[in-house]
Amino acid sequence: MDTIILGIESSCDDTSAAVIKNGVLLSNVVSSQAVHEAYGGVVPELASRAHQQNIVPVVHEALKRAGVTKEQLSAVAFTRGPGLMGSLLVGVSFAKGFARSLNIPMIDVNHLQAHVLAHFIKESEEDNNQPKFPFLCLLVSGGNSQIILVKAYNDMEVLGQTIDDAAGEAIDKCSKVMGLGYPGGPIIDKLARQGNPKAFTFSKPHIPDYNYSFSGLKTSFLYSLRDWLKEDPDFIEHHKNDLAASLEATIVDILMDKLRKAAKNLKINEVAVAGGVSANNGLRNSFREHAGKYGWNIYIPKFSFTTDNAAMIAITGYYKYLDNDFCTIDKPAYSRVTI
C-alpha cells in the first residue's frame, strides 16, 4: 500500500504544501510574501494574515499537482516549531483539522530537523544521492547556525551552535546597514561575485568547541563602515562589491573552520549543508574546495530546498510515519526549540 504524506510549512513568511509518495516528491508549492520587503524584515502580524489567506489554495494546488485526492493521504505532517508563533498556529491548526476530518494520523515536525532531512527528498525513484549515516550537517539560516551530527533520520545531536546572532541574521543586518535592502542574503551573494574577498578585513571570534558567534563580526563591520564613511560619504557605493565579498568570505571562513575541525575530530567525511544560507555561492564553493582538499563526500541541496518549503516537512513526516511516530491533537506549536 502506498504511503502518501501531505506536508505543511508555515513557520515564518512562506506558506508551503507538498506531497510525497513512498519517499518520492510529487509536488511542492510555495507562496512567498513580498509585503515584508518594505519593512526591512518579517512583520509577524502581516505574516499570520497572509498564511490564513494562502494556506487553503496552496494545499489545494499541492494535491492537484500531485494528482492525489485528500482521501488517498496516509497522514498530514506539519511544522510545529520553531518559528513565529502566529505563523505556526495557522499551519498547525489547519493541519490538525484537516487530518482529523480525514481520520488519518497527524505528524509534528521539527523545522530544523526537516532542513537536515531535505537531503533525502527524492524527485524520482532513481534519485539516490543521499548522505550516508553518520554524517555532519552545517545548518545555516537567518535564525540558526549549527553543526549537527546526524546518526539516523530521527537521531541528531547538536555539536555546536551560535551563542548570539546566526550567520544569516548577520548578513541581513550588514546588508541593511549598507542600505541594500531585505532580505540581504541574495543581495550580498550577487554583489560578492563581482568583488575582492580580500579587500577588507573584519574581526573573527575565538569561541571554544564547535560554537559560533557573529555579533562581533557585525559590530566590526558597522564600526569600520562608520569610519570609512567619515572619510568618503560615497564609500559604500564605491566599494559595495568588495564589502560584500569580504563580508561573505569572513562568514564562510568562520563557518568552515569549525566544521572542518568537527569532521577531523570525529573522522567523518560525509558532510552536508542545509538552510537558507546554503544557497550562498561562496559557501557552496568552499564546500567543493573542501571536498577536493580533504576527501569529503559533500551534499549541497537544490536551491528550491534551501529556503523554507513543505517538501522537507513531508519527507521528515514520511520517515516518522514509517516509525509510527505520530502526535496527538493536543500538542501545541512552539516558537523556540532546538533539535
From Swiss-Prot:
Transmembrane segments: none annotated. Belongs to the KAE1 / TsaD family. PANTHER family: TRNA N6-ADENOSINE THREONYLCARBAMOYLTRANSFERASE (PTHR11735), TRNA N6-ADENOSINE THREONYLCARBAMOYLTRANSFERASE, MITOCHONDRIAL (PTHR11735:SF6). One of its GO terms (molecular function) is N(6)-L-threonylcarbamoyladenine synthase activity. Fe cation binds at residues 111, 115, 308. This is tRNA N6-adenosine threonylcarbamoyltransferase. Its main location: cytoplasm. Its EC number is 2.3.1.234. GO terms for cellular component: cytoplasm. It catalyses: L-threonylcarbamoyladenylate + adenosine(37) in tRNA = N(6)-L-threonylcarbamoyladenosine(37) in tRNA + AMP + H(+). HAMAP family: TsaD. GO terms for biological process: tRNA threonylcarbamoyladenosine modification. Its cofactor is Fe(2+). Binds 1 Fe(2+) ion per subunit. NCBIfam families: gcp_kae1, T6A_TsaD_YgjD. Required for the formation of a threonylcarbamoyl group on adenosine at position 37 (t(6)A37) in tRNAs that read codons beginning with adenine. Is involved in the transfer of the threonylcarbamoyl moiety of threonylcarbamoyl-AMP (TC-AMP) to the N6 group of A37, together with TsaE and TsaB. TsaD likely plays a direct catalytic role in this reaction. It comes from Phocaeicola vulgatus (strain ATCC 8482 / DSM 1447 / JCM 5826 / CCUG 4940 / NBRC 14291 / NCTC 11154) (Bacteroides vulgatus). It comes from the Bacteria. It is found in: Cytoplasm. InterPro entries: ATPase_NBD, Gcp-like_dom, KAE1/TsaD, Peptidase_M22_CS, TsaD. Keywords: Acyltransferase, Cytoplasm, Iron, Metal-binding, Transferase, tRNA processing. Substrate binds at residues 139-143, 172, 185, 189, 280. Gene3D superfamilies: 3.30.420.40.
